[in-house]
A protein has these predicted regions:
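The canonical Cys-X-X-Cys-His
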Residues: 142-158, 184, 208-212
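Immediate post-signal-peptide N-terminus of mature secreted/exported proteins
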Residues: 24-65
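Short, solvent-exposed, charged loop/turn and helix-capping segments
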Residues: 49-97, 162
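Gly/Gly-Pro-rich "capping" loops immediately C-terminal to redox-active cysteine motifs
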Residues: 155-190
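Electrostatic cytochrome c docking/interface patches
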Residues: 30-32, 110-145
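Positively charged n-region of N-terminal signal peptides that target proteins for export
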Residues: 1-4
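Bacterial N-terminal signal peptides
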Residues: 9-21
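C-terminal capping alpha-helices of c-type cytochrome domains
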Residues: 73, 95-124, 197-221
Length: 221
């Protein structure tokens, strides 16, 4: 018990330091810029699934719907990012307008190449705490967050729905940690720009990511 309390105290201290270090980053790298970068990574992951030959028809349909929706969202995200940082409008909406055309023309490989290039220009910058891996001592708290926020849709039971919500334990281990973090950042607020901000702190998100990637989940077996 004493060891656990010491570890939690350590995390609180680290979180405080991270808040100071991330504050300066946030000034130059705002919420909309982060959302833009995260959506670019999620789009690449969805597009790679779409290109896989063993993807089921129902998943192909749902992936197509999600990709089209996210591509349409990018231009709005660019404008919002520019408004948030009016001192340097580095995000050019013209770079994103051709993406929907490529998708509508079934030019999927050129589209993937373009998205990868854009991610190089607009990388997802994570705070140090979001890049950290937490030990199993924190997984009880993560389990509570999972049951409260995620399990209703992401238990795996909805995997064959028109818009499937995949098992997060399995998904987190089948893709890179960066892409999974991007999916958590975008998924917790939904796809609508006007929805509520992410309800979790970076520390809570990082604990959840560590939990999904490392915990043995009986329901996922």
């Amino acid at each position: 018990m004493k060891k656990t309390l010491v570890m939690f105290a350590g995390v609180l201290f680290i979180s405080g330091v991270v808040l100071l270090s991330t504050a300066s980053v946030s000034l130059a790298y705002g919420e909309h810029s982060q959302r833009l970068a995260a959506n670019l990574l999620v789009l690449q992951g969805d597009l790679r699934q779409l290109l896989e030959t063993d993807t089921s028809d129902i998943h192909l349909h749902s992936l197509s719907l999600r990709i089209k929706e996210k591509l349409g969202l990018l231009a709005l995200l660019v404008r919002s990012a520019n408004e948030q940082d009016s001192t340097s409008n580095t995000h050019n909406p013209e770079e994103f307008r051709q993406l929907l055309f490529l998708f509508g023309s079934s030019e999927l490989k050129p589209l993937l190449s373009k998205l990868e290039s854009l991610s190089g220009k607009y990388p997802l910058v994570l705070s140090p705490i979001l890049q950290s891996t937490f030990s199993p001592v924190f997984f009880k708290k993560a389990e509570e967050m999972h049951l409260r926020l995620c399990s209703g849709c992401h238990s795996g039971a909805m995997a064959e729905n028109t818009l499937p919500a995949f098992d997060l334990f399995r998904q987190s281990r089948s893709i890179s940690r960066l892409e999974f973090a991007a999916r958590m950042l975008t998924g917790l607020r939904g796809d609508q720009l006007t929805s509520l901000q992410n309800p979790l702190t970076d520390t809570e998100l990082s604990v959840l990511i560590s939990y999904y990637r490392n915990e043995v989940n009986e329901l996922s077996k």
